[in-house]
């Protein structure tokens, strides 16, 4: 990924010089479902998949959320991550993740998407709900809306980082 002032390396390292990492069935799916920062990097522009999966559609309700597509793509499947940059991304102008309408759509559509998996993966969905709320709380903190920030942070995982956000939101 390349920004205006610095280059950020977002490529995983292969431990055995093969140049790729292999992930077991559902390993990437569960990592994405729980919004974990550990696991396969799945940047939208660099996901390569077999043509037999082209029937998996992007959501059309909001027209901008890829979370459900990623979940469907990796559910019950093995995957491979190429450990080299497939493209450089230039970031200019406005940042979509700071757009309130995008964040609101992402929040509600993420909850809708994970509800599909609630019966089969209850603890993972519960963890995902907390992380989605934490993300929304940190967004409102960054935007300066401390009341809304606290509302969502209180629904997230209570850990030191969350407590510090809550304390400094008053």
Residues covered by each model-derived region:
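Membrane-interface aromatic/basic loop that binds lipid-linked glycans or pyrophosphate carriers
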Residues: 140-170
């Amino acid at each position: 990924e390349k920004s205006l002032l610095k280059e950020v390396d977002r490529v995983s390292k292969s431990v055995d010089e093969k140049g790729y990492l292999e992930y077991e069935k559902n390993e990437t799916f569960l990592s994405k479902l729980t919004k974990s920062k550990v696991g396969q990097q799945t940047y939208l522009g660099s996901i390569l998949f077999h043509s037999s999966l082209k029937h998996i559609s992007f959501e059309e309700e909001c027209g901008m959320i890829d979370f459900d597509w990623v979940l469907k793509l990796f559910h019950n499947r093995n995957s491979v991550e190429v450990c080299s940059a497939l493209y450089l991304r230039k970031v200019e102008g406005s940042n979509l993740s700071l757009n309130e309408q995008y964040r609101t759509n992402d929040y509600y559509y993420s909850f809708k998407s994970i509800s599909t998996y609630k019966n089969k993966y209850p603890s993972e969905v519960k963890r995902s709900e907390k992380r989605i709320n934490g993300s929304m709380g940190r967004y409102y903190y960054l935007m300066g809306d401390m009341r809304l920030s606290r509302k969502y942070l209180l629904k997230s995982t209570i850990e030191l980082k969350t407590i510090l956000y809550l304390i400094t939101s008053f």
